[in-house]
């Protein structure tokens, strides 16, 4: 899951070296904390949150493959 999210996010941002992921996995849940450079925050969130919504949808559906619930937190 980490590699999947990292690959997608790095394709969106200018400062790839500042993409940070922290993945906490329990028996039924995967929590992914995402941090990017301040300049790239708008690209990750998108207009009216559409990009963030799309990223969360991808993560949610990818986690369903393992019958888990996924939460993507975009932190500043």
Label the model's feature ranges.
Residues 1-43, 54-76:
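RNA-contacting regions in translation and RNA-metabolism proteins
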Residues 45-49:
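Glycine-centered tight-turn and secondary-structure capping sites
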């Amino acid at each position: 899951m980490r590699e999947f999210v990292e690959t997608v996010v790095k394709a969106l941002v200018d400062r790839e070296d500042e993409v940070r992921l922290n993945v906490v996995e329990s028996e039924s849940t995967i929590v992914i904390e995402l941090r990017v450079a301040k300049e790239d925050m708008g690209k990750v969130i998108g207009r009216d949150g559409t990009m963030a919504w799309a990223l969360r949808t991808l993560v949610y559906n990818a986690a369903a493959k393992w019958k888990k619930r996924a939460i993507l937190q975009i932190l500043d």
